[in-house]
């Protein structure tokens, strides 16, 4: 495999969730433009597609040469090899009837478009240029012959994702991703595990336990738990404790 750190090609990127889209460009493993953040408009398919085109055009206008490709992550199961997004996507409800997103962007920009699952790409990135080579380098420096080639990576945030790398290769599974977000919630069988470990889970549990009507983010709730912000410390601690408990159940069912 070529060393991506010495590769001079430019790739436009997108980090998307239900609220915002952050557009950028990478070369040699480094971002080369200031990120551009736009509202995702994930509830409206036409607006969402227009936002994607607008964001990538804004990035392209900052580059000194034509980008080689577009590459980005998307949540949930999909036909990633063909660039088709479909299925019950909690974060992007307007995509549930199926959208040929890869072919659409390829036609708009005239370059290859690579889309994959967010959890898979996180794990793949850590396997190529993150924690896995760092561990192997430490082993080499210590004189050990042991080398690791397998990695399981979990991502937390707007949702809950996982990626699996086996012998240096991404395991896409039968649905183009390895997924855990749809496991049942052990405390509330009417919802899925993602509703117990995501950003909205921490916010919901704290609000339910404390009765605090403020619109707080997990960082605020963490500060309450640490005693740095006014609020119910007991409820804040319990919100994160429940997240940790449910995460453990998802990782080791």
Q: Predicted segment positions?
A:
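Glycine/GP-enriched mid-protein hinge/lid loop-to-helix segment characteristic of carbohydrate kinases
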Residues: 6-10, 22-26, 30-37, 45, ...
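Phosphate/pyrophosphate-binding loops at sites that engage ATP/ADP/AMP, CoA/4′-phosphopantetheine
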Residues: 52-70, 112-113, 211, 250-253
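N-terminal helix-turn-helix/winged-helix DNA-binding helices
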Residues: 1-8, 14-16
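Interdomain hinge and pocket-entrance segments immediately C-terminal to HTH DNA-binding domains
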Residues: 10, 17-19, 80-84
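N-terminal phosphate-binding loop and adjacent alpha-helix
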Residues: 30-66, 231
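Short glycine-rich anion-binding loops that position phosphate/pyrophosphate groups of nucleotides
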Residues: 75-78, 157-159
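Amphipathic, non-transmembrane alpha-helical scaffold segments
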Residues: 237-244, 248
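Glycine-rich phosphate-binding loop and adjoining helix at the ATP-binding site
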Residues: 41-50, 66-70, 76-148
């Amino acid at each position: 495999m070529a060393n991506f750190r010495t590769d001079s090609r430019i790739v436009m990127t997108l980090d998307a969730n239900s609220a915002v889209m952050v557009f950028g460009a990478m070369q040699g493993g480094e971002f080369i433009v200031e990120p551009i953040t736009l509202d995702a408009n994930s509830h409206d398919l036409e607006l969402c597609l227009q936002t994607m085109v607008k964001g990538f055009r804004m990035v392209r206008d900052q580059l000194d040469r034509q980008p080689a490709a577009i590459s980005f992550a998307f949540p949930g199961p999909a036909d990633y090899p063909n660039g088709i997004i479909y299925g019950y996507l909690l974060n992007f409800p307007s995509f549930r009837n199926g959208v040929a997103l890869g072919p659409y962007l390829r036609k708009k920009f005239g370059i290859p478009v690579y889309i994959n699952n967010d959890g898979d790409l996180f794990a793949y990135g850590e396997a190529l240029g993150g924690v896995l080579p760092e561990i192997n380098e430490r082993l080499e420096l210590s004189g050990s012959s042991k080398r690791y080639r397998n990695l399981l990576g979990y991502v937390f945030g707007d949702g809950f994702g996982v990626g699996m790398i086996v012998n240096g290769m991404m395991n896409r599974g039968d649905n183009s991703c390895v997924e855990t977000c749809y496991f049942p919630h052990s405390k509330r069988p009417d919802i899925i595990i993602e509703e117990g470990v995501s950003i909205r889970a921490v916010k919901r549990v704290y609000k339910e336990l404390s009765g605090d009507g403020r619109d707080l983010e997990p960082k605020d709730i963490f500060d309450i738990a640490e005693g740095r912000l006014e609020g119910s410390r007991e409820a804040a601690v319990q919100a994160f404790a429940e997240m940790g408990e449910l995460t453990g159940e998802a990782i080791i069912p």
